[in-house]
Structures are given as C-alpha cells and as structure tokens.
C-alpha cells in the first residue's frame, strides 16, 4: 500500500469563482469538500474536448491526460494542486464534484469526459476487468440476479474499499451518477477511518496484519485470487485498509469470527456519512482511509440508476508534493 502525504501548498485559498470553480466544506462533514465548476468553465471544457469522442479516450490513453490539462488550464492551473492536496490530506481526502450544466443522462459521454479529466489530474485510472475499459458503467434496477451486491437495490451495500481483489494499487475511487429514474433512497455511505470508533481495537489485533485471501465472483472477470492483510500503514505509520466483506475468504474459524466482528463494527458506526449524489455529480475519495457503501433503495418497478466508476493510483510531480515521514 502507498498512502501518501502532501506538502502544504497555497491551494487552501482557492475558493474564488474567478478560478472557474468554487470550493467549500460539505454540509455532511468538513472532511468532505464540495467542488463546483461554473457553467462557463463547463461549457468551455466541453467545447474544447468535443473533438474527441469517448472512444478516443478509450483507445488513446494519453488523451485522458490531455483533457485533464485542458480542464486545469480553464481553472487557471489552480485545480490540479487543489485536487492533489485534498486527496492526500488525511484530514480530508474526499470530494463531491459538480459541473453546472451537466445533469442529464443524455450527457453521459460528457460526464465520462469530465470525470476522466479530473481523475487524470491526480493519477491514472486502472483497467477495469468488469468492463474492459479504464472505467465501468453499470445499471441498478428493481430486480437483480447478479453475483454480488453491486447491483442489488433493496439492501445496504456494506462499507468497503475498492481494489481488494486485484494486484494494482488503488489509491482513489471515483463514483459518478449518470442517471436516476423512480428513485428514493440509495444515498452513498462514507466512513473516514479515523472517525471509526473501533479502529484501535481491530488495528491492534494480531489478525490485522495477517495475509488473507480475496476472491472475486465471475462477473468481475478476475481469474486469480490475491493475498494481502486487511490493515496496513502509510508512510507515517497511520492505519489504512483494503477490505470488502463479500470477497475476503477466511481460512479458519478464528479469521471468520474476527472478520464478522469487524463487519458489524463498521456497519454500526455512529460516524457514517449519508451523502446524496444527484445526476451529474461524482464522489472522489482516497481509497485507503475512506470506506464507501450504499444505502438501500425504496422498491419501485421502474427503478433505474446508472453509475460510472474509475479507480486508480496517484501520480504527480514531486516538485510540489512528496512522501515523507
């Protein structure tokens, strides 16, 4: 694992609309920041990237960074340092991002372009085996027969980290709302690791560092298991996690009981945030010290929600940011 820490920059002061966006703490928590691109910035960005369809971003990976450069330039080159600082800051590490004028499923391709630009200002999104691309789009409906909780609407999808069953580093997760019809409930659930009341109890347990087997169901298109502990530490010795209840495979009674207790302790935390994410908005979180999940939906025969995700690793210039003890 490689949780990184940012050197402080003057990005703290970037809250002005003249930068092309606004930036402020969310109503849910000061750890979760809201970033909103102005209608002017959004329109200029879409106009400048119109020449590249989403397929071009799929086929030519360097274009993902180019669209990021365009977005950053429209924001006076103040966006990238702010994103990096926020994602690496242990006290924050989460963003709810909105672009004025993008709020309809008919703009799905524009949503993918915007999310791609933001993600590739902080790093690179990994190959997603479920979709065969660097991003995945999937639909939640009222009835589901899939082999994981990802698309099941009428139950809580428990708190977890992404990237637990792959070997690639998964520093960040991006989750975007593309469409929503006949929908009530289903808020995103977030828990910052430092706000979890039972962290010390489980982090100090002998099983916290034991390598465990993680195996994905067939729909994930991953053919081999991976092994790693549930807990690790960052460069400064602070706890980080790689955990998901559905895919960890305890080898014995001791591991099974400990994992069950851990799951219960996460789900009963009093500090879970419930965050509505309207169509066109997306969450971007540090995957190593934020856990995420989803609340249940209210049943409806025509329920439909479409989501897009990207997950990847941090990469940035060490002239401004570095790891340190």
Swiss-Prot record:
Entry note: cofactor: Binds 1 Fe(2+) ion per subunit.
Molecular function (Gene Ontology), one example: ferrous iron binding
Pfam families documented for this protein: CsiD
Keywords on record: Dioxygenase, Iron, Metal-binding, Oxidoreductase
E.C. number: 1.14.11.64
Cofactor: Fe(2+)
GO biological process: L-lysine catabolic process
InterPro entries linked to this entry: GlaH, TauD-like_sf
Catalytic activity: glutarate + 2-oxoglutarate + O2 = (S)-2-hydroxyglutarate + succinate + CO2
Residues passing through the membrane, by range: none
Superkingdom of this protein's organism: Bacteria
CDD domains: CAS_like
Functional summary from the UniProt entry: Acts as an alpha-ketoglutarate-dependent dioxygenase catalyzing hydroxylation of glutarate (GA) to L-2-hydroxyglutarate (L2HG). Functions in a L-lysine degradation pathway that proceeds via cadaverine, glutarate and L-2-hydroxyglutarate.
Subunit structure: Homotetramer.
Name of this chain's protein: Glutarate 2-hydroxylase
Originating organism: Citrobacter koseri (strain ATCC BAA-895 / CDC 4225-83 / SGSC4696)
